[in-house]
Amino acid sequence: MPVIISNKLSKEQEEKLVVVLKEHKTALGWTIADIKGISPSTCMHRILLEDNAKPSRQPQRRLNPPMMEVVKKEVLKLLQSGMIYPISDSQWVSPTQVVPKKGGITVVENHQGEFVPTRVQSGWRVCIDYRKLNSVTRIDHFPLPFIDQMLERLSGRSYYCFLDGYSGYFQIAIAPEDQEKTTFTCPFGTFAYRRMPFGLCNAPGTFQRCMVSIFSEYIEHFIEVFMDDFTVYGDNFDACLNHLSLVLKRCVETNLVLNSENCHFMVEQGIVLRSYCVVQGY
């Protein structure tokens, strides 16, 4: 089970951490096939339209050969994992586009000698242009947390675990009656989503509401949640490890899967929402 942990841990601390991770190994995912899906009874995405909404069927957009290969690979992956399915009679059809994909946050030194967080392009991302659908969708006003308050609660802790949801949106089901509204067209056919894709205007609110529901009694006590970025913390190793165990247990119970490659366990500093979170403050 290769995972990223602090290189400052003692042998005993490493062993304790490994025991906890092995005990909750189903909370960690390696491929999209590991996503089981959060129960619709816990959370499900709805697409509610304004009363005067008129369906829109848009044509596919032209893609150059390299981008067609990107789309083909993505469509096959999503079909095989059951995230999408072919559809031919939808009243709503949106076009596909390909945009640069940003990788994880890294730290680079600028011209002033300051270390700043940045993202580098790591490939291409297939997105659906849902602007017409979004323009007639009733807006969900579920609030996101204030970042400055989150950082205040996080600063000065001894240990952190930075956790990342695996393809977070894809873990939430779309209501069956709303799936056809997510239909997209590409050179390989028309497909609709069973799980919540990027690009829907209310997806962030649905996801945040779902995470708050899952971790409600833990938030602001030993975990901070901002979309699919979760930060577990503690004032000493054993406290942080116990908090991590509780969070992973909740993940297993709710089928929430974390991206094992992007999680950092029991570290003393890191980056939260592009801000340093260190022992001395932020």
Residue spans of the language-model regions?
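Retroelement reverse transcriptase polymerase core
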Residues: M1-Y282
